[in-house]
């Protein structure tokens, strides 16, 4: 690969081999004027540019010699009228005007009518050759047709926000020294701050440029997209030009005028999306020309602080701080912090005292080179918690729901807010409140004291609101697109929990996905395989109605692969597919006689009950299996008229995969459980099962944890039976669904896909749920569906699927090392649900939900294990975190007023030199201390 990084190597190369285009390599001698111009506007100190440098190849194909001639005579940031330029260039007005218009259209120059220098009292139009960054780099990348025709300008932009800064960033003082951009906080976050000054507020700048605003394309989003590192945001209209710059972007067809209210609406939408406000920072305290709404995954300006680990390049005068007592470790601030300054930790004291959390090293007293940089900042900033861990409930939940958060809101009687918080990760809380396997409760720290908090029952109470059209919660859409929704069509194949979760989060993001379901109604296994006495179908319908309200289309009775193919859907305009067809059928009972007429898959049995109303059973029923499906099958058999029901499983009684609740429900209904037995043979009479022989199971797994049951063949138990219902595995039925695609399969029949993105070998096809993981629970499928939505959004927008992606990895705090002062917590015993005896052994749910009084008592039992922790050394004071917290637990404080000192770029050394001298003194003192300590 040709060195495209200049004469000096950098540790952060632009990988040319990964680009979708070739960096130009001219076959002619370099043009000296372009070399001079490129060097002049970028000012890379100590570089003698060659044709291999970005300063040359970034301009060579766009800028003519005639343009370069004029630009070189203009000088950098020295405004001139056309009359002055006529004198300098010796050109006639008409050809010069035409050339200047072409240069402005291209983005090489700008113009304005201001008189800040006192040399333009009549406010004549003056032309300026700007710096490359911020300046012509943005202008060159603010027109999609230009980037498409000359993609090297995107690479030029990326290089010039890196190479000129490699050596200087550690020496930049607070305030940024007139270099690049400057973070300006969310205004609402500082509205009560008495010492806030005008230039720290968006409204101040908008009023300063009253009536002159224009929205325009984000050059960072557009250029990064061209480099194959897009973030999925729509690139249009995120950047707001103000003052004369608004006229420039409109007149050169880079933007359109907007009103004050429209500008404020864009800023609010940016905050909703977690974007950072930044103002230009090269003109001192009296002028800016743009306010950007920046996504850290693509922003070249934020990169200057994040990649070099030098926050002074960006930070505002404010620092976030958490009020620990209010914090509930919901993680919203963590997920949205652009700088990775907030992570989840714990409130609970340890036996060794309270945890002291580390702070990031800063360049103030340390020599700073590439070894100190944070090259992978976009991924590292998405680390969710400290190694010491956080709340076990959030960690254990596959969807990582903010359990501690919604318990707190419920305790305060804020049920709607609690429902909103749950649905950020789980669109089916009413469903899960009835069927979840409650891993959060298994992990609950309270369980080490007495009993776990009844988390799921509280969730069920909260989610009752979703069952009423008047009180259900329909989320506001948070769309990373300024004007309207996304138009790309996405198909969800399979209307189960994974598919519907994917559809929900795509709709929330601004899509109108279509769910294709082969059955007559959506819901998948929720509707057709979970008995209604556990999950009444009006509950599922109510939560599906929320999807309809969001704009999700359901096409039921359509089997993709049979009624319509993926190829045909592509012809209809579908750009992406999420395949979540589940495991629709049971496997075989692989023992002699296992194919007898009355040996039936438990899943097929339940589906027959729900889809075809097949409810007649006679005689003795034997259920084989120990999971939650086996419990459902056994209890359904009771309701279908079985004379008796017995359940046999390999595992010991305490190790049965079904939960304690399922086991007790079975026993309440007279189902006999025989734990530790495996099927040996089905004995038949006239082709039908009459008896089934079981042998004693001594162990289920080997030392490595692999399924390898060991039996005592001499210990046999016979079970007479009229019907055998086996629940020992499920399988996907693909048929012709994926015919003609490149999707590959695992030996067990599940689809192969990337474990992070769920993308298959066919790029536009993603998979999720049981069809990918094998048999799991509804909450696992729901979590996978949200990740599928994230991938599909990124994919159809042409973005990277992985960079800056939250991997949703959490660590459980060490409960054994937690110091819990039992006397300081509520000692009320765990609340219990009631039962409606009139509904016992019917197909209605006999469980009675908690009352409000029980919810209040139960939520008081939460120990409040987790909390967010801010590293002030990393915080850039953007205030995004404050917009996400529903508990007012994180606020901005004006602790760094020096960060609001703004310089003109021409005066940057006036700021840098004093700071550099002080820093060098600190470094030498630190080195002397280190040497002394070493002795």
Language-model region placement:
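Ferredoxin-like iron-sulfur electron-transfer modules
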Residues: 61, 91, 127, 278-291, ...
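A conserved FAD-binding loop/helix module that cradles the flavin
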Residues: 633, 771-796
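FAD-site-proximal beta/loop scaffold in flavoenzymes
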Residues: 595-618, 702-775, 790
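Flanking helices and flexible, charged tails adjoining ferredoxin-like Fe-S electron-transfer domains
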Residues: 339-392, 407, 453-455, 459-489, ...
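Glycine-rich dinucleotide-binding loop and its adjacent helix/turn
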Residues: 462-484, 509, 542-562, 586-640, ...
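Beta1-alpha1 glycine-rich phosphate/pyrophosphate-binding loop at the start
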Residues: 401-404, 410-411, 452-456, 492-560, ...
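A short, conserved structural fragment
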Residues: 104-117, 342-343, 890
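Short, amphipathic alpha-helical interaction segments positioned at domain boundaries
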Residues: 119-162
């Amino acid at each position: 690969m040709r060195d495209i990084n200049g004469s000096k190597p950098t540790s952060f190369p632009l990988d040319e081999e990964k680009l979708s285009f070739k960096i130009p390599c001219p076959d002619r001698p370099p043009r000296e004027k372009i070399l001079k111009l490129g060097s002049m506007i970028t000012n890379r100190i100590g570089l003698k540019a060659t044709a291999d440098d970005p300063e040359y190849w970034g301009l060579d194909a766009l800028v003519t010699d005639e343009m370069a001639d004029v630009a070189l005579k203009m000088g950098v940031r020295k405004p001139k009228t056309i009359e002055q330029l006529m004198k300098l260039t010796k050109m006639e007005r008409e050809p010069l005007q035409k050339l200047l218009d072409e240069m402005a259209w291209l983005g090489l120059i700008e113009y304005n009518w201001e008189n800040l220098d006192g040399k333009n009292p009549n406010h004549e139009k003056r032309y300026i050759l700007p710096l490359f960054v911020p300046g012509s780099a943005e202008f060159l990348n603010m027109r999609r047709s230009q980037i498409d025709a000359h993609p090297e300008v995107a690479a030029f932009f990326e290089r010039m926000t890196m190479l000129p800064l490699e050596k200087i960033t550690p020496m930049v003082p607070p305030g940024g020294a007139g270099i690049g951009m400057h973070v300006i906080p969310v205004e609402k976050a500082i509205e009560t701050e008495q010492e806030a000054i005008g230039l720290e507020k968006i409204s101040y700048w908008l009023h300063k440029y009253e009536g002159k605003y224009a929205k325009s394309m984000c050059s960072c989003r557009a250029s990064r997209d061209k480099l194959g590192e897009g973030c999925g945001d729509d690139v249009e209209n995120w950047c707001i030009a103000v003052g004369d710059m608004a006229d420039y972007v409109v007149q050169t067809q880079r933007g359109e005028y907007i009103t004050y209210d429209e500008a404020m609406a864009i800023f609010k939408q940016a905050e909703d999306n977690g974007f950072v406000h930044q103002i230009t920072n090269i003109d001192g305290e009296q002028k800016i020309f743009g306010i950007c709404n920046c996504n850290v995954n693509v922003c070249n300006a934020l990169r200057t602080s994040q990649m070099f680990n030098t926050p002074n390049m960006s930070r505002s005068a404010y620092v976030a701080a958490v009020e620990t007592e209010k914090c509930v470790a919901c993680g919203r601030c963590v997920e949205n912090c652009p700088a990775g300054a907030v992570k989840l930790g714990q409130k609970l004291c340890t036996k060794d005292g309270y945890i002291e959390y580390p702070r990031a090293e800063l360049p103030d007293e340390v020599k700073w080179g590439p070894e100190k940089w944070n090259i992978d900042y976009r991924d590292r900033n998405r680390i969710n918690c400290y190694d010491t861990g956080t709340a076990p409930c959030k960690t254990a939940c596959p969807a990582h729901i903010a359990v501690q958060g919604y318990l707190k809101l419920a305790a305060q009687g804020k049920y709607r807010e609690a429902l909103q918080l749950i649905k950020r990760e789980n669109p089916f809380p009413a469903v899960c409140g009835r069927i979840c396997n409650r891993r959060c409760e298994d992990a609950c720290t309270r369980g080490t004291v007495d009993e776990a908090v009844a988390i799921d029952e509280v969730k069920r109470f909260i989610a009752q609101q979703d069952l009423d059209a008047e009180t259900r919660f329909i989320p506001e859409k948070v769309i990373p697109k300024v004007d309207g929704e996304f138009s790309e069509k996405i198909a969800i194949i399979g209307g189960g929990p994974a598919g519907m979760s994917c559809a929900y989060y795509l709709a929330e993001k601004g899509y109108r996905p279509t769910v294709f379901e082969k059955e007559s109604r959506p819901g998948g296994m929720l509707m057709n395989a979970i008995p209604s006495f556990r999950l009444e179908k009006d509950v599922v319908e109510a939560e599906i109605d929320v999807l309809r309200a969001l704009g999700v289309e359901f096409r039921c009775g359509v089997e993709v692969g049979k009624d319509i193919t993926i190829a045909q859907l592509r012809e209809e305009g579908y750009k992406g597919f999420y395949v979540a067809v589940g495991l629709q059928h049971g496997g075989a009972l692989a023992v002699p006689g296992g194919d007898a007429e009355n040996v039936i898959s438990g899943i097929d049995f339940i589906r027959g009950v729900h889809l075809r109303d097949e409810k007649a059973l006679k005689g003795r029923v034997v259920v084989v299996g120990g999971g939650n499906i086996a419990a459902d099958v056994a209890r359904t058999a009771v309701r279908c008229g079985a004379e008796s029901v017995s359940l046999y499983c390999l595992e010991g009684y305490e190790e049965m995969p079904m939960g304690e609740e399922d086991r007790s429900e079975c026993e309440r209904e007279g189902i006999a459980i025989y734990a530790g037995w495996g099927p040996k043979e089905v004995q038949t009479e006239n082709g039908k099962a009459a008896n089934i022989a079981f042998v004693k199971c001594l162990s289920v797994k080997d030392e490595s944890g692999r399924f390898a049951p060991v039996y005592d063949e001499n210990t046999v138990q016979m079970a007479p039976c009229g019907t055998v219902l086996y629940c020992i595995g499920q399988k996907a039925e693909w048929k012709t669904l994926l015919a003609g695609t490149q999707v590959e399969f695992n030996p067990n029949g599940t689809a192969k896909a990337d474990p992070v993105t769920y993308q298959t070998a066919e790029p536009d096809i993603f998979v999720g749920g049981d069809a990918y993981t094998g048999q799991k629970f509804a909450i696992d499928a729901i979590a996978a569906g949200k990740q599928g939505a994230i991938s599909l959004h990124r994919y159809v927008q042409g973005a990277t699927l992985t960079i800056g992606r939250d991997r949703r990895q959490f660590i459980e705090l060490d409960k054994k090392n937690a110091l819990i002062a039992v006397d300081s917590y509520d000692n009320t015993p765990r609340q219990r649900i009631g039962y409606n005896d009139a509904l016992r052994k019917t197909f209605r749910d006999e469980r009675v939900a908690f009352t409000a009084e029980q919810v209040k008592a139960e939520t008081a039992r939460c120990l409040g294990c987790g909390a967010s922790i801010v590293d002030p050394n990393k915080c850039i004071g953007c205030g995004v975190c404050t917009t996400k917290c529903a508990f007012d637990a994180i606020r901005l404080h004006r602790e760094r007023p020096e960060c609001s000192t703004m310089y003109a770029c021409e005066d940057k050394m006036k700021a840098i030199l004093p700071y550099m001298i002080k820093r060098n003194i600190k470094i030498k003192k630190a080195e002397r201390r280190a040497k002394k300590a070493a002795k």
